[in-house]
Curated annotation (Swiss-Prot):
It comes from Mannheimia succiniciproducens (strain KCTC 0769BP / MBEL55E). The gene is uxuA. Signal peptide: none annotated. One of its GO terms (biological process) is D-glucuronate catabolic process. Its EC number is 4.2.1.8. This is Mannonate dehydratase. The lineage of its organism: Bacteria, Pseudomonadati, Pseudomonadota, Gammaproteobacteria, Pasteurellales. Catalyzes the dehydration of D-mannonate. It comes from the Bacteria.
Length: 394
């Protein structure tokens, strides 16, 4: 696998020099300064590419070219945004970039309730607490109809949780959920957030699929033509939240994807941390079944807690993900491609990482501190080497 690292651009506290020392060779990057929907010009792409290459690295994957909200809701100028998206893909291809990760999650890119959950060893992780989230939705946001989402017991626990919250607690939880995380292109006030949710109130999962199908059938042929592999990222967490439709969460959703637009350019990001939150997702089976369409891998593990809808991000080789067999399946696919004359390795990045050691004293992007990811990348490098020696290079 190609060892890559997500870099948020010149303002990232983790520098390209740091990344090179970590042993990564590929950079995962996006032009975050360009507003959603606008074309990424060849000039802007080349400017960023030159910065990366001057550091001795390669711009391996774009993550993400954001899908404008009006494309998802099929309102306003969505056809213009789609044409702009096509042009961005053409421009990326012209600059030699061949892999684009994106998602079709409405409103929020990824959602956590705690961005600094302290683990027993003193390091900090990201966490999603189902009861804290219910308290936010029922008593802070007060989303109409939210009570239908929760059991009577969950509502009772959420009320008790909310009653113990201080004003500072409420502010922090709200900020964690809606203020925008790394990779989320927008942050919202409570009022703006509810307004965004309201745009989806008449969009069922079935209708949302028709919007996604329209997008795919417009975009994927262009990607196919210019030689770009599109790798959709799953919902995070992979289930409906906030009354929003979520349609990239299961192996059935992956099959729908392939059936809806069956071109090789239409593929997946295997994010083990997102898919792995659901106990009914067999990550090894998913990787094996759709291996020929996996163009990017986010390797991360989560640990479900006593409430099975609550989880925190575990160390990369621990938690609920069978990382040994997922990586083995990815390598099996990579060797299959190699036998067919394909030289492109599957880009892999250590997804998130615990805040630990010296990083505990620094301001870092939640989930994207340096040392936790350095540790994860080193572990995956060792796992890959061992798997290759035992199973693939006899």
């Amino acid at each position: 696998m190609e060892q890559t690292w997500r870099w948020y651009g010149p303002n990232d506290p983790v520098s390209l020099a740091d990344i090179r020392q970590a042993g990564a060779t590929g950079i995962v990057n996006a032009l975050h300064h360009i507003p959603n929907g606008q074309v990424w010009s060849v000039e802007e792409i080349e400017k960023r590419k030159a910065i990366i290459e001057a550091a001795g690295l390669t711009w391996s994957v774009v993550e993400s070219v954001p899908v404008h909200e009006e494309i998802k809701t099929q309102t306003g100028n969505y056809k213009t945004w789609i044409e702009n998206y096509k042009q961005t893909l053409r421009n990326l291809a012209q600059c030699g970039i061949d892999t684009v990760c994106y998602n079709f999650m409405p409103v929020l890119d990824w959602t956590r309730t705690d961005l600094a959950y302290e683990l027993p060893d003193g390091s900090k992780a990201l966490r999603f607490d189902q009861i804290a989230f219910a308290a936010f939705e029922l008593h802070i946001l007060k989303r109409p109809g939210a009570e239908q989402t929760y059991t009577a017991e969950e509502q009772k626990q959420a009320k008790a949780y909310f009653d113990k919250m201080s004003d500072a607690d409420i502010k922090q939880l709200t900020s964690n959920i809606i203020a925008g995380l790394p990779g989320a292109e927008e942050g919202y006030t409570l009022e703006e957030f509810q307004g965004q949710l309201d745009r989806y109130k008449d969009i069922s999962p079935e209708k949302f699929r028709t919007h996604l199908a329209y997008f795919l059938n417009e975009i994927i042929p262009v990607a196919q033509e210019v030689g770009i592999k599109m790798a959709v990222h799953p919902d995070d967490p992979p289930r409906p939240i906030l009354g929003l439709p979520r349609i990239v969460s299961t192996i059935e959703d992956m099959q729908w994807y392939v059936d809806t637009c069956d071109l090789p350019a239409n593929g997946f990001t295997m994010c083990t941390g997102s898919y792995g939150v659901r106990a009914d997702n067999d990550l090894v089976k998913m990787t094996e079944k759709f291996g020929d369409r996996i163009y990017f891998a986010h390797l991360r593990s989560t640990c479900r807690e006593d409430n099975p809808l609550t989880f925190h991000e575990a160390a990369h080789l621990q938690g609920d993900v069978d990382m040994f067999n997922v990586v083995k399946a990815l390598l099996t696919e990579e060797y299959r491609r190699k036998a067919n004359g394909e030289t492109r390795l599957i880009p892999m990045r250590p997804d998130h990482g615990h805040q630990m050691l010296d990083d505990l004293k620094k301001k870092t992007n939640p989930g994207y501190s340096a040392i936790g990811r350095l540790k994860g990348l080193a572990e995956f490098r060792g796992l890959e080497m061992a798997l290759k020696k035992v199973f693939f290079e006899k």
